[in-house]
Structures are given as C-alpha cells and as structure tokens.
Amino acid sequence: ALNCASGWSGGYDQHCYKVFDIPPSWAADEKFCKQQTSGGHLV
C-alpha cells in the first residue's frame, strides 16, 4: 500500500497527489511543486 504524507492523497499509479489553490503560471507552479516534496511535478 502507498503511504502518503498528511494532507496528500495517493494510490493512483503509485504516486501521491495534493491540490493547491495558487495563481496560474506554469513555471511558478512547477517550481512550487518541486519545493513541496522530492520529485514533485505539476500535472
């Protein structure tokens, strides 16, 4: 079973997910995602 950090959802394709409400800008949002966790990416 996949164990995700508190506040994160998981299970799909063995990845954890979290929804953030932040202003749209792909480059800034990708940077934000990478800062949240190792290997994080905007999807």
Swiss-Prot record:
Q: Which SUPFAM superfamilies match?
A: C-type lectin-like
Show the GO MF annotations. Answer: toxin activity
Per its Swiss-Prot or TrEMBL entry, what cofactor is needed?
Ca(2+)
Q: Where is the C-type lectin domain?
A: 1-43
The residue ranges crossing the membrane are none
What UniProt keywords apply to this chain's record, in alphabetical order? Answer: Calcium, Cell adhesion impairing toxin, Disulfide bond, Glycoprotein, Hemostasis impairing toxin, Platelet aggregation inhibiting toxin, Secreted, Toxin
Identify the InterPro entries for this entry: C-type_lectin-like/link_sf (IPR016186), CTDL_fold (IPR016187)
Residue pairs linked by disulfide bridges in the UniProt entry? C4-C16
Role noted for this protein: Binds to the platelet GPIb/IX/V receptor system and inhibits ristocetin-induced platelet aggregation in human platelet-rich plasma. Strongly inhibits platelet aggregation induced by ADP, calcium ionophore, thrombin and collagen. Does not inhibit U46619-induced platelet aggregation.
For this entry, the protein name equals Snaclec lebecetin subunit beta
Q: What is the lineage of its organism?
A: Eukaryota, Metazoa, Chordata, Craniata, Vertebrata
